[in-house]
Amino acid sequence: MKEVIRTEAAPAPFQGAPYSQAIKAAGLVFVAGQVSLKPDHGEIVGDTVQEQTEQVLTNLRAILEAAGSGLDRLVKTTVFLQSLDDFPGMNEVYRQHVGDQPPARSTVEVAKLPSGALVEIEAIALA
């Protein structure tokens, strides 16, 4: 059985798209890709990849906490970057949030992200 996770502490699905912030199933939490949208105004926060990564991780944390999990329970993330030139800046912030046992991770350069975002992160965590 699956449980849909929703929280107002993170952005609602982008432009009303048909997806959930997260799904809890089989002892795991599957979090939809998050960009640096602020939940209260729905606009991208930050001009640098560091600022945007900070907001993305804030959004991920809020969703994971709503599911009874947290960043310390991450097992896999996928990072989408507008440019791999931003890899060091993203890593600088990411490292501060994932502790000394970071999750498995893939990082991919993409042609475009929603609303001109520089970074998007999706995640799987233990429930």
Write out the residue ranges for each language-model feature.
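N-terminal presequence-like segments and the immediate start of the first folded domain
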Residues: M1-T58, A62-V75, L81-A127
